[in-house]
Amino acid sequence: MKKIWNRMVCAMLLCILVTAATISANAAGMIDTNRDVALTISYQYNATAISGAKFDIYKVADVDAYAQMKVTDHFAEYPIPSDHMSQDDWNDFATTLKSYVWQDSLKPDFSGQTDGTGNWKTTVKPGLYLVVGSRCDVNDMTYTASPFVVFLPGSNEEQNTWEYAVTASPKADGEKKPSTDTRISRKVLKIWEDGDKKTSRPKDITIHLMCDGNVYDTVKLNAENNWRHTWDNLDQNHEWLVSEDTVSGYTQNITQEGTTFTVKNTSTTKTTTPSKTKDTSLPRTGLLWWPALALMAGGLLCVVIGLVRRRGADGE
């Protein structure tokens, strides 16, 4: 009986140690929301530094000490699906955020340009930020930076700490300037994700084609034109983007592949089918469930103490 008792105690103590180790390994601690984050934009193309490139930074969401986000007032009116968003999801959503910025002429929180080494350094407070770069001409090349979203401070998963010095490297596309007046085309395609509930969709939606941040043309997409449109005879020496007027009951996501923009509207109507989607939201990783582990460890410890006291009482 004594051996069984000793094994039980050892097993419980082992559970406590494993649980405590798990807590230590997965909790990066609280974010110091008053501390500045040093952000460096490092802009290169094929290992060549791009100087004189202008970047604008927009704060999309504030963050608290527990890495919980709250969308800022500037972006609160837009249908932003902030729940269950991983870092890759946010980057896929960056073009949509850029379309909001262009359509409504939102002012950036920070602006600057890269130096001779292709770097721009600034300091910001913790939060979720959209970074938008402008087209940049250097010698006979034109460079375009893909917009991206960054959560600050950064997360060091190996050391389980928050990093308050972060370097971000935007994806750059480069092409030689055309020697003649080259004309291009742009296409927009609408996709509905609503369980094929066509009766719930609006009869048409409004799409704006924007040129360097200004509205160039406006069209209506509907079933008659198969929810698509093509613009021809556009000047290649400008940056083109589409935006969509908000559709009630739907979120929107704009992506670009080559010369085609895809505008996807996803229904926000809740269904009764249980969702099995895993929460991969970057700011929540390893931060919200550690209190439950601590309670588990405390509970196991209480059980061990209780059994020890009971055995002591029985032995008296």
Give the ranges of each region predicted by the language model:
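Solvent-exposed loop/turn and edge beta-strand elements of beta-rich ligand-binding domains
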Residues: 2-316
